[in-house]
Amino acid sequence: MREPAPGAEPVATPPASHWFIYMVRTASGLLYTGISTDPLRRLRQHQSGKGSRALRGKGPLTLAWQQAVGEKGAALRLEYRLKQQSKAFKEQLLTQPERWLACSQSWLATAQTQKRPRYAAAKEGSDNRECQRQVD
């Protein structure tokens, strides 16, 4: 590894496992949720038609929201839970970002205590009330 030139700023090394959860807004106002290590790169892929099929032909796309979540496993669990939420809940998340911390912590804690087979997973919406109570 090369040493930086004298007087040069050291280059920060990104964390080994730094994942983001993000939402992309389509031209018609739909919100798409995904995960990536680089949301801006992923947005460019979606815009070029090389990303998710769900976004192909949906007009101009904008990155509406992104949040660092750490490890890939946590990102996958949070993406799964966020995709289950209503559009109204997601819109509130965009305008009230403090809600994310309460919900993500609750969802990850629930995932740790409820280890169950994938086929047994049911749509879980009851955590929304807990998230709202924690934020209010």
From Swiss-Prot:
CDD domains: GIY-YIG_UPF0213. It comes from the Bacteria. Signal peptide: none annotated. It holds the Pfam family GIY-YIG. Residues 114-136 are annotated as: Disordered. Residues 124-136 have a biased composition (Basic and acidic residues). InterPro entries: GIY-YIG_endonuc, GIY-YIG_endonuc_sf, UPF0213_domain, UPF0213_GIY-YIG_endonuc. Residues 17-92 form the GIY-YIG domain. Belongs to the UPF0213 family. This is UPF0213 protein AHA_3736. The lineage of its organism: Bacteria, Pseudomonadati, Pseudomonadota, Gammaproteobacteria, Aeromonadales.
